Amino acid sequence: MNANPKFLAATAEVDAAAVAPLPKSRKVYETGSRPDIRVPFREISQDDTPTMFGGERNPPLTVYDTSGPYTDPDVRIDIRQGLPALRKAWIEERGDTELLAGPTSEYGKSRLTDPKLTAMRFDLQRPPRRAKAGANVSQMHYARRGIVTPEMEFVAIRENLRREQYLETLRASGPDGEKLARRLQRQHPGQSFGAAIPTIITPEFVRDEVARGRAIIPANINHPEVEPMAIGRNFLVKINANIGNSAVSSGIGEEVEKMTWAIRWGGDTVMDLSTGKHIHETREWIVRNSPVPIGTVPIYQALEKVDGKAEELTWEIFRDTLIEQAEQGVDYFTIHAGVRLPFIPMTADRMTGIVSRGGSIMAKWCLAHHKESFLYERFEEICEIMKAYDVSFSLGDGLRPGSGYDANDEAQFAELKTLGELTQVAWKHDVQVMIEGPGHVPMQMIKENMELQLEHCHEAPFYTLGPLTTDIAPGYDHITSGIGAALIGWYGTAMLCYVTPKEHLGLPNKKDVKDGIITYKIAAHAADLAKGHPGAAIRDNALSKARFEFRWDDQFNLGLDPDTAKEFHDETLPKDSMKVAHFCSMCGPHFCSMKITQDVRDYAASQGVAEQEALQKGMQEKAVEFVKKGAEIYHQT
């Protein structure tokens, strides 16, 4: 089906699971230089450490939060109304945009006036906005003029994760607070491969990174609901979640539900890859209810407009589609402008040919007309559209390898060089750019991808799908790709596109979305640790401390997926009393290494000696006991 026949705008409601509070967590905000810059975080409370000396306080830990207002109990969520337009004042006060009378794309107009769509249409009351004649409204344009926008300040506060406040709270937590702060912020030196990540992210640093093209802030002026975020090598590694219906599966309600589910678990951006009949309406519902940037592949919808016949695509249809989606508020477009006619023969000897949907569409068009791609030839005209709405480019890798066999071949790298050339064209227009990457790449070949991308694309952010490191595990490609994602994230990729267990097999459901998100949150965080991102180890250290102290609930809640952690624990130790037990089901009460170590520490404290001395003393006592019992290894019982 193309849209759920039961979906009606009048009865649409938020997924209850998306607004349920996470365990022992609360939404907190940090206010910037003006009261309407309120940056959201999730604060996880912890139990005190149970010690023989009366307990040690473990202050709440702040973590990055992508869930938007959905997890704020003070905000009433009604998806029929959409989210609050938090950037509205920022956009208006710049004075470089104007409200339109309504949609200006032909397709947008036709959908708005089609009475058959009334029952499912999102009832948007405000008209779209566009740059005034001659104006450029991109964050890169402001950055290059030396302007620090509220969006840039928002990003800076968000990236710092209230780390300094947390450390100050640790220092003030008790007599050993200073020692505790030192322990919890301890971090192994990283290898950043040239990334220059400051200890404190300032708004000026964000501005400079955006001006240089090393970072982007995807934030369409028609998506005022978005909470600004940055994608760049010198920021936290981000992840994207793909959703979208098809001609045979899912509908509007399910896709909005997937979006809210994805951001609950940590999706930094969401791509709507819908290919069904009601693409326009589905996208409107998603954008109006999304606090994270939304990306699309406009060629998919353009293809639907010509009944799936790639050879019938025209520049005029594609241009109208870009304007339609820009006026809805899409924050970044994947555009496969690097798929050029001369490159197509390079794929002839591949094992898996051209696997990108967008790439194959444009390859077919080029061959049908024996002409250069209109995306390539009209690229400057595309830039004019992008800068009028501040839509960022995600330059698509239409010739990415679809198997390890095809990795790092001539076609892939020819396209990459072209994407670098197009990046400089876009930057001439002050349009923000990131570069898409593979794909399927064996581990030993991954680093070359990152090095060549930095060289050819002038440090524009890299955004990769995995890469998958082996092709033998259908049903487990979230794992095969998570391995590659962690590696390429370490080498410098700015955003990782998740892969779900359903990759190559079918469209993901909610469970698949969550599995993909958690896998990629692990990969992104592992990359941050390996790069030596300041403060990246604090959460690891806090969880390790909770684990050693047998604070089971804190172990669950500090993790990426508290629900699953608690579920696994409860399968073998279900009683509440087991949440304070000093062992788990793996080793049991008598063989727990952490319990034994804790016993040594307690013994040392009671004897007034150091831990090493306590170990020696304990072993001497046991030796005497062994001799007294007859020096026999085994005894009759």
UniProtKB/Swiss-Prot annotation:
Offer an example of a GO molecular function term for this protein. Answer: 4 iron, 4 sulfur cluster binding
Recorded family membership: Belongs to the ThiC family.
Q: Name one Pfam family in it.
A: ThiC_Rad_SAM
Its name, as the record gives it, is Phosphomethylpyrimidine synthase
Q: What NCBIfam families does the record tag this protein with?
A: PRK09284.1, PRK13352.1, thiC
Q: What class of enzyme is it?
A: lyase
Functional note: Catalyzes the synthesis of the hydroxymethylpyrimidine phosphate (HMP-P) moiety of thiamine from aminoimidazole ribotide (AIR) in a radical S-adenosyl-L-methionine (SAM)-dependent reaction.
Q: Where does [4Fe-4S] cluster bind?
A: C584, C587, C592
Name the InterPro entries on file.
Answer: ThiC, ThiC-associated_dom, ThiC/Bza_core_dom, ThiC/BzaA/B
Can you state the subunit structure given in the record?
Homodimer.
This protein's cofactor list reads: [4Fe-4S] cluster
Q: In which pathway does it act?
A: Cofactor biosynthesis; thiamine diphosphate biosynthesis
The UniProt catalytic activity note for this protein reads: 5-amino-1-(5-phospho-beta-D-ribosyl)imidazole + S-adenosyl-L-methionine = 4-amino-2-methyl-5-(phosphooxymethyl)pyrimidine + CO + 5'-deoxyadenosine + formate + L-methionine + 3 H(+)
Signal peptide residues on this chain, from the entry's feature table? none
- Record-annotated residues binding Zn(2+)? H440, H504
| Taxon lineage | Bacteria, Pseudomonadati, Pseudomonadota, Betaproteobacteria, Burkholderiales
The UniProt entry's GO CC annotations, sorted and at most eight, read: cytosol
Q: Which HAMAP family match?
A: ThiC
Per UniProt, substrate binds at N242, M271, Y300, H336, S356, R357, G358, D397, G398, L399, R400, E436, Y463
Provide the E.C. number(s) assigned to this enzyme.
4.1.99.17
Which key words are in the record?
4Fe-4S, Iron, Iron-sulfur, Lyase, Metal-binding, S-adenosyl-L-methionine, Thiamine biosynthesis, Zinc
Q: Which GO terms describe its biological process?
A: thiamine biosynthetic process; thiamine diphosphate biosynthetic process
How cofactor binds (record note)?
Answer: Binds 1 [4Fe-4S] cluster per subunit. The cluster is coordinated with 3 cysteines and an exchangeable S-adenosyl-L-methionine.
